[in-house]
């Protein structure tokens, strides 16, 4: 990669802003190098790499997809470096003014009407982490039938911004970029 003229980066959709900003700065300092970012759900990108798509760098939001690529011998364990951290947050449309007050007797399922939106709980990293959190808190089962799974955090954010879901679980960095939640 050090001598490449083009560097193709596959990155989780949740990293769109960060990778775009970093790429611009890098290209300004290294005018002979072009960064070509490709953003999608980590699962989609990992499947593309497994099928033979070429990428110089892969930023996954989920270690499971990295491990899948190791098993398929598409990357080596020594190539993995944890670089970024994020956290899940609960969002709602700004006009909704939900005020969730956490306490020992808090009933999340009754705290809002309608749907909760997050990434697909079996494949999208944010959805997998949301499922773990909701399960740990004992909130998953009471919400069954009210959870909408999306293909990425950005899709979840869009659903909540439009009011199609009353609440959503996304990464903090994605929530902070929106003026509508």
Question: Language model features by range: what are they?
Answer:
Residues 2-30, 34-53, 60-63, 67-73, ...:
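Exported/periplasmic ABC-transporter solute-binding proteins
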């Amino acid at each position: 990669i050090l001598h490449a003229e083009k560097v193709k980066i596959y990155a989780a959709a949740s990293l769109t802003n960060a990778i775009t900003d970093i790429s611009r700065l890098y290209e300004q300092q290294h005018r002979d190098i072009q960064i070509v970012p490709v953003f999608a759900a980590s699962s989609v990108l990992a499947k593309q790499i497994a099928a033979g798509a070429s990428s110089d760098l892969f930023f996954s939001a989920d270690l499971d997809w990295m491990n899948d690529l190791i098993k398929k011998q598409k990357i080596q364990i020594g190539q993995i470096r944890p670089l970024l951290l994020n956290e899940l947050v609960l969002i709602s449309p700004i006009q909704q003014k939900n005020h969730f007050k956490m306490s020992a007797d808090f009933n999340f399922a009754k705290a809002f009407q309608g749907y909760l939106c997050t990434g697909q709980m079996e494949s999208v990293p944010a959805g997998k982490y949301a499922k773990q959190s909701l399960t740990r808190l004992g909130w998953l089962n009471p919400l069954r039938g009210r959870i909408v799974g999306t293909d990425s955090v950005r899709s979840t954010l869009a659903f909540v911004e439009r009011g199609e879901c009353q609440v959503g679980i996304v990464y903090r960095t994605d929530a902070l970029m929106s003026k509508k939640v």
